[in-house]
Each structure stands twice: as C-alpha cells, then as structure tokens.
C-alpha cells in the first residue's frame, strides 16, 4: 500500500489583467521550481485601485504538492 504525503505552501501572485491571470502566473512560476503540484486553493482575492480603476489583481493561494519519497 502506498501513502501519498502532500506539502502546502502559501503563494502570492499579481497581474495587471485579471485574477485568473494572477492565478495562472503564480502556478506557472511555481511549476518552475516545484514538482508534482496537485492542486491550488485560492484563499484571498484583492485588487489595488487607482483613480477608480483596478491597476493590480492579487491572489493569495495555497499550493499543494506531493512530497517525493
């Protein structure tokens, strides 16, 4: 019987386009140094506003990845 162990790391990512773009950029960047990513949980959505317009979308995510044996 095999046991899977996951580790969870917090990540903050930003975009000037959208929240979805911020999530995708964060996942893409994390994938360059973390292997076996199994899921993400976006825990917070924020935006920076200037002159009535959103200038930055920010997401806080929990990234789950499998610990290698």
Where are these regions (language model features)?
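A cross-kingdom feature marking charged/low-complexity
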Residues: 46-69
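Alpha-helical assembly-interface signal, strongest on the long, hydrophobic N-terminal helix that forms
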Residues: 2-3
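Short, well-ordered alpha-helical segments
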Residues: 6-38
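Conserved beta-strand segments that form the floor/walls of ligand-binding pockets within enzyme
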Residues: 7-10, 41, 58-62
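Amphipathic, hydrophobic secondary-structure cores in small proteins
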Residues: 34-52
